[in-house]
Amino acid sequence: MVRDIVIYPNEILKKPTEKVDVIDKEVKNLIRDMFDTMYEAEGVGLAANQIGVPLSVMVIDTSPKEDAPPLKLVLINPEIKEGEGKIKYKEGCLSFPGLSVEVERFQKVKVNALNEHGEPVELTLEGFPAIVFQHELDHLKGITFVDRLKGWRRRMALEKYQKLLKSRK
């Protein structure tokens, strides 16, 4: 089922999510709905709080991006164990419709999480999948991609976003 995407400045986007203790039918339905919502919005990643659910769950599917390796993941209670290198990439966000900003992130990350079956997974992500993972992990921590900007860059991005919001009304 496609759910509504929470739009910034909704408060849920500013609060850290809660760890998932039990992967029950409700969580499995959430995961299915997250994929449905992400595909409908033509995104490549989605955090649960972006559809109003304050749980530490993300879904990623990089296959729509032609120049990225196809990767489909469900990650529950994810964390970065290690990061290396730096990469700048112009990111968009489903919770900031129409806005894209250049953000610096790790080029490569080692990740621990649970999969949709509750099994521990360790992954090494590099390039675009690493960027998507870090973007979604930030959401789960209550951080948006605009929060990664400093000074005038942040101010300009927020001003541009306000104009985009007004033009949508």
Swiss-Prot record:
Binds 1 Fe(2+) ion. Coiled coil: none annotated. Fe cation binds at C93, H135, H139. It catalyses: N-terminal N-formyl-L-methionyl-[peptide] + H2O = N-terminal L-methionyl-[peptide] + formate. InterPro entries: Peptide_deformylase, Peptide_deformylase_sf. One of its GO terms (molecular function) is peptide deformylase activity. Its EC number is 3.5.1.88. Its cofactor is Fe(2+). Pfam families: Pep_deformylase. Belongs to the polypeptide deformylase family. This is Peptide deformylase. The gene is def.
